[in-house]
From Swiss-Prot:
UniProt-listed PANTHER family: ATP SYNTHASE (PTHR15184), ATP SYNTHASE SUBUNIT BETA, MITOCHONDRIAL (PTHR15184:SF71)
EC number of this enzyme: 7.1.2.2
Cross-referenced HAMAP family: ATP_synth_beta_bact
Class of this enzyme: translocase
GO CC aspect terms: plasma membrane-derived thylakoid membrane; proton-transporting ATP synthase complex
Phylogenetic lineage: Bacteria, Bacillati, Cyanobacteriota, Cyanophyceae, Synechococcales
Family matches, as Gene3D superfamilies: 2.40.10.170, Bovine Mitochondrial F1-atpase, Atp Synthase Beta Chain, Chain D, domain 3, P-loop containing nucleotide triphosphate hydrolases
Location in or out of the cell: Cellular thylakoid membrane
GO molecular function annotation: ATP binding; ATP hydrolysis activity; proton-transporting ATP synthase activity, rotational mechanism
Protein name: ATP synthase subunit beta
Binding positions for ATP per the UniProt entry: 163-170
Length: 477
């Protein structure tokens, strides 16, 4: 016999279990609304305690609803009581969430103390109205030279971070969290969507060691969890970030890794709900689901949510519906290059492949725009000359091209930078470089003023003054 452990006014019972999806019947006139959270708390005949939260997705008629599970449905049987909570999934928000790891339901999973949150918020809400949005596009300084110069982040914008395994995505994410915490007194929220459990664990431990954990809230929906949890974990993290923006009036960074897995989970749920698949087997509601998430990530008059999203591209096909739908929402793309990582240039951001919609003279200013274009032109010319150099050697180039190559190699090295969060590995103190110092440094390299300095002087330094100082030390050796 199945015994109920929950008492509530609106109780139905399970009529069908299909993997992570259930159908439940409720009394006439007491149907739960779409997105309401349902709870099953019961004990099976074998003595197994079952506690599962569901989210209503469809109203089927005949007083029945179809709902998707947020955790494993093992042990569920027909006839078990289902309680309608009368509201969507609500999660803790505010300062109490910092330094903790949560699951999709806002429950701490780091074996720490219970979360003493004063406020809770539903994960489903509308995007801010137009009148609340800030109109003026404004660059967001990160202190990382290559990003600030060539792919500037837009305050309240969305950045796509493209990179394979081992090229430095996690370290770049940690450095951004560190810099926003130190320089902007800002906070970060990290959403692990379909993350490997090991990666999530590593990130938590690395943040603890580097001292940025107290400025970040972590929300994980791992690979092994049901599609419902992976589909909603991004909204849980976003809800926590929205509180810091709207109530605390702060600038927040929201990291989502990986946005493709959010789409993938939505596709699984769509199939389980019996919807007709769309192109390449994706859900017909792909653009709507993506829009509902992305439109909430924005700048308002109170504060901003700037989002950095890792994007996996299936089979390197940029026309695949998942990345193609994501691209429509991005303001900047930061591409991490394996060839730069192999040269030891970190962060391994590809200066020619990375771009930003706000790199325009009327937004960032003439000086910044012209410097960025000159840097790109120099690096592009160097790239074109590399085949000639490989076949004929450097000596066969014209004097003008030799000069371009020399400056491009200095620029390439000056785009590298020591990170605060990597101090324990490199032994070099981290550097936060202000935008005006970044622009000034590249202008001096481009002008030829520093042609006499050795290339090595520009490697892993912050400002151009440090490069000159390093050159003096190298000379004295």
């Amino acid at each position: 016999m199945v015994t109920a452990t929950a008492t509530a006014t609106n109780v139905g019972y399970i009529t069908q279990v299909i993997g992570p999806v259930i159908d439940a019947e409720f009394p006439s006139g007491k149907l739960p609304e779409i997105y309401n959270a349902l709870k099953v708390e019961a004990t099976t005949e074998s003595g197994l305690k079952v506690k599962v939260t569901f989210e209503v997705q469809q109203l089927l008629g005949d007083n029945r609803v179809r709902a998707v599970a947020m955790s494993s449905t093992d042990g569920l049987v027909r006839g078990m009581p289902v309680v309608d909570t009368g509201a969507p999934i609500t999660v803790p928000v505010g300062e109490a969430t910092l330094g903790r790891i949560f699951n999709v339901l806002g429950e701490p999973v780091d074996q720490g103390e219970p979360v003493q949150a004063k406020e809770f918020a539903p994960i489903h809400r509308s995007a801010p109205p137009f009148v609340e949005l800030t109109v003026k596009p404004e660059p967001f300084e990160t202190g990382i030279k290559v990003i600030d110069l060539l792919a500037p982040f837009k305050r309240g914008g969305k950045v796509g971070l493209f990179g394979g395994a081992g090229v430095g995505k996690t370290v770049l994410i940690q450095e951004l969290i560190h810099n926003i915490a130190e320089e902007h007194s800002g906070l970060s929220v990290f959403a692990g969507v379909g993350e490997r459990t090991r990666e999530g664990n590593d990130l938590y431990n690395e943040m603890k060691e580097s001292g940025v954990l107290d400025k970040v809230a972590l929300v994980y929906g791992q690979m092994n969890e049901p599609p419902g949890a992976r589909m909603r974990v991004g909204l849980t993290a976003l809800t926590m970030a929205e509180y810091f923006r709207d109530v605390n009036k702060q600038d927040v960074l929201l990291f989502i890794d990986n946005i493709f897995r959010f789409v993938q989970a939505g596709s699984e749920v769509s199939a389980l709900l019996g919807r007709m698949p769309s192109a390449v087997g994706y859900q017909p509601t792909l653009a709507t689901e993506m829009g509902n998430l992305q439109e909430r990530i924005t700048s308002t008059k109170q504060g901003s949510i700037t989002s950095v999203q890792a994007v996996y591209v299936p089979a390197d096909d940029l026309t695949d519906p998942a990345p193609a739908t994501t691209f429509a929402h991005l303001d900047s793309t930061v591409v991490l290059s394996r060839s730069l990582a192999a040269k030891g240039i970190y962060p391994a951001v590809d200066p020619l492949d990375s771009s930003s919609t706000i790199l325009q003279a009327d937004i960032v200013g003439e000086e910044h725009y012209n410097t960025a274009q000159a840097v790109k032109q120099t690096l592009q010319r160097y790239k074109e000359l590399q085949d000639i150099i490989a076949i004929l050697g450097l000596d066969e180039l014209s004097e003008e091209d030799k000069l371009v190559v020399a400056r491009a190699r200095r620029i390439e090295r000056f785009l590298s930078q020591p990170f605060f969060v990597a101090e324990v590995f490199t032994g070099s103190p981290g550097k936060y470089v202000k935008l005006e110092d970044t622009i000034k440094g590249f202008q001096r390299i481009l002008s030829g003023e520093l042609d006499h300095l050795p290339e090595q002087a520009f490697y892993l330094v912050g400002t151009i003054e440090e490069a000159i100082e390093k050159a003096e030390k190298l000379k004295s050796k």
